[in-house]
């Protein structure tokens, strides 16, 4: 039986987001498999959950964009040596630079193995290229792998591994329906939803690239076609985004659907909101690396309508092809929405993209690399 590993994950902070969630998911899997899990970050609200599940958190501000951060390089090198670290897994660019510099200064024969994960379609250049310095480079989708090879043609394709993010089917079970009390409370909070009209939902922070305008225009187009609907912009109300929210409200009023649009702050009951909708929208104007919301909705059995670009298009083509539409064609978007609502098409259950599969693939990669021949990078 192979010996337990000591794995350290590096990221800026542990507050919220897909990178942070993935870090906790791998930390949990390491502990469950009998390995030692260390996480280095500046801290955040997820630290308690991390340590409760058996990992150790080491507070270092490896995400601070300052020359002073270079002083952390010898600290990290000492940490790797003193803790007997087997795998260093960097999940963000600045932590990757600090981790790489610390790792590169160690003895090739005894230093840890170095892994990176490319979580996004980062700007192309020297700073981002550090994410390709890993002895193994995890890409969270085929879209990311293609992007890396297109923009960094000298990359060693043999070191790239596609390991898609996973969704826990127990957390997002197919056919889930929230209880009546939840729905009553939610409608009481948002009286615009009290009509029989179907609900549409777009989950995303208050950013212009998330497609909120396109969603409002879609609801207006549906109304003009005689198909009434209600739109929930879940998570758009954030501190500092008040002007943007006002802009969206004015747009809805100008298009005659001010009574049909609900805008909320980020919520913990995203699963129940999505499960109550007839359509979940993913209309980001820029390609995304993955699009976790798409996968969560499809796992619930809720149709997703999204642009056929990036990781969103990749998932829809594989799991729910009727939901993929070309960007930049509002008429086609409205027609596809009308058809999906009218025919009540539902994605069938599927076993791929599970959380356990992602965890198993990542731990297998660690073990594969630990046993692989060493070489200078």
Task: Place the predicted regions along the sequence by residue.
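Short His-centered aromatic/hydrophobic patch
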Residues: 90-96, 118
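Conserved acidic donor-binding segment of nucleotide-sugar-dependent glycosyltransferases
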Residues: 318-331, 339-343
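Short hydrophobic beta-strand element within catalytic cores of glycosyltransferases
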Residues: 39, 303-306
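Active-site donor-binding acidic/aromatic loop of nucleotide-activated sugar
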Residues: 240-245, 258-267, 273
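A charged, aromatic-enriched C-terminal amphipathic alpha-helix characteristic of glycosyltransferases
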Residues: 18, 171-178, 342-374
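A conserved, positively charged/aromatic
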Residues: 104, 108-142, 154
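Acidic donor-binding loop of glycosyltransferase active sites
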Residues: 275-289, 302
């Amino acid at each position: 039986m192979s010996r337990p590993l000591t794995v350290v994950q590096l990221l800026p902070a542990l507050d919220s987001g897909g990178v942070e969630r993935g870090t906790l998911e791998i930390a949990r899997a390491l502990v469950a498999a009998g390995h030692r899990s260390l996480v280095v970050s500046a801290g955040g609200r997820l630290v308690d959950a991390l340590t409760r599940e058996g990992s150790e958190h080491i507070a270092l501000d490896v995400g601070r964009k300052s020359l002073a951060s270079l002083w952390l390089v010898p600290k990290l090198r000492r940490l790797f040596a003193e803790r007997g670290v087997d795998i260093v897994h960097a999940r963000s660019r600045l932590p990757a630079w600090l981790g790489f510099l610390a790792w590169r200064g160690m003895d090739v024969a005894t230093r840890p193995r170095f892994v990176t994960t490319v979580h996004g379609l980062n700007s192309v250049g020297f700073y981002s290229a550090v994410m390709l310095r890993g002895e193994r480079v995890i890409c969270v989708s085929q879209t990311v792998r293609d992007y890396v090879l297109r923009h960094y043609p000298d990359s060693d394709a043999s070191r790239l591994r596609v390991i898609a993010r996973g969704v826990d089917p127990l957390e997002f079970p197919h056919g889930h329906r929230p209880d009546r009390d939840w729905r009553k409370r939610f409608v009481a909070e948002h009286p615009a939803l009290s009509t029989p009209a179907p609900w549409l939902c777009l989950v995303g922070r208050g950013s212009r690239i998330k497609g909120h305008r396109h969603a409002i225009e879609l609801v207006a187009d549906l109304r003009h076609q005689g198909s009434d609907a209600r739109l929930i912009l879940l998570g758009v109300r954030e501190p500092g985004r008040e002007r943007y929210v006002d802009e969206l409200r004015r747009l809805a009023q100008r298009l005659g659907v001010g009574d049909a649009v609900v805008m909320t702050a980020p919520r913990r009951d995203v699963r129940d909101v999505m499960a109550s909708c007839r359509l979940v929208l993913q209309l980001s104007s820029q390609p995304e690396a993955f699009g976790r919301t798409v996968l969560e909705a499809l796992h619930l059995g809720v149709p997703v309508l999204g642009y056929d670009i990036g990781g969103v298009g990749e998932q829809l083509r594989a799991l729910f092809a009727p939901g993929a539409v070309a960007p930049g064609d509002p008429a086609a978007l409205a027609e596809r929405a009308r058809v999906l609502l009218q025919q009540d098409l539902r994605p069938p259950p599927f076993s791929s993209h599970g959380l356990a599969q992602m965890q198993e693939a990542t731990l297998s990669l660690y073990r594969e690399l630990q046993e692989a021949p060493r070489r200078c990078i």
